[in-house]
Amino acid sequence: MARAKAAFYCTECGNETLKWQGRCPACGAWNTIVEQPDKDSKKKAGLPAPVGVDMRHPRLMAEVEAVDELRFHTGMNELDRVLGGGAVKGSLVLVGGAPGIGKSTLMLQICDNLCRFSSVLYVSGEESERQIKLRAQRLAIREEGLYLYSETNLDDIVAAVQGKKPDILIVDSIQTIYNGDSNSSPGSVAQVKECTMALMHVAKGLGVTVFVVGHINKEGSLAGPKVLEHMVDCVLHFEGEEHNSYRILRAAKNRFGATNEIGVFEMGDQGLIEVPNPSEAMLSGRPENMPGSCVTCVMEGVRPVLAEVQALLSPSAYGNSRRTSNGFDYNRAMMMLAVLEKRGGLALSNCDFYVNVIGGLTLNEPAADLALITALASSFRDKPVPFDLAAIGEVGLTGELRSVSAVNQRISEVRRLGFTKCLVPARSTGKIIAPAGLTLIRVSNIREAIAVLI
């Protein structure tokens, strides 16, 4: 006997149940369980089938013709890098970020570049067409080939795409679009899921490249159901600090390229400006002969980026010491503090602890461990690290230094930025080739590193 299908769902989290309940068992919200519309009664005629796909019969893999995905350049090298060499025709790209970070500005500047050789339909559910044009004029966006449409109804948007047949569709934002066949309100889990599914059919069925803007919630993750990120082809996070002009576009998912790639932009009066050399930008204005600062090199995808790690240790004036970390994983920073105290012989238990990564970068890889250890020891002893020195290496719980990946790429970037000395683990996997003018200082543990530098 076939199992009964779920007839109710939660409008907050999308959880499906067999019967009505006052409280959702998944998210705990009250009075959010509603009856699910009959799926068989929904009209699917407005959603085209994917191009070149036979939806009627299964096919042998040997019979499927393999064709390389057609890419095109967006006109922004940093965005092309994050997308894996350009946008793919018929792909669905989700761009998320905090309010005011510059998502709409990025989308308009993409329009300016793409309108030169293709037609673009810009759909906004948050601004009127007049407001979009005023903002476009401020950014000096070209008007030829760019269609503006202020609409939130999904059926009207799909009809406009089928009528205008644009090459690129931009939807700002997915939380404002609604499907009239659904009983839930715009922005709800069910609406976001259904609208994204419809846009996916538009992208695959008509071969239109779709960029969708998404909001983030208070936890910093994309608002809406988690399935939203599984449905799209690419997930891009647009990050930045409120009082910092630099913006970082990071790929969290990419079906057509590598993940963890980043693109760096600077927000100015004329919109977003690409930063082709992020290492130099992150180190601009670095003070000389100041304790508590050390430079390291991290890999963002295949791109080496130099980052300045700053640390401050000061005697605690109260009973409990304060511990804060900005841009460096808090748990890993606490681990480095404990290793330095235990294996490095420094009494840090009565000190307030502050860590900051300059430029808005977030360091998640272990290669920055040695730079943090060096900056902490420098701050504790109030002696500066040599200005022309960088530190690369992972630190274990016993205080030993371990090798990291892509060492030669990292030290080449270090030398390119004018550094003459680099602290590296004594034992590294593979042969390390030092560039001309760069001296490698090999150490086995943190005690040796502190003794050599400070």
Residue locations for each model-derived region?
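P-loop (Walker A) phosphate-binding loop of NTP-binding proteins
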Residues: 98, 125
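Peripheral, non-AAA+ core regions of ATP-driven protein-machinery
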Residues: 2-12, 16-81, 88-94, 101-119, ...
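Divalent metal-dependent catalytic cores for phosphoryl transfer on phosphate-bearing substrates
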Residues: 129
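Conserved RecA-like ASCE P-loop NTPase motor core of nucleic-acid helicases/translocases
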Residues: 120-124
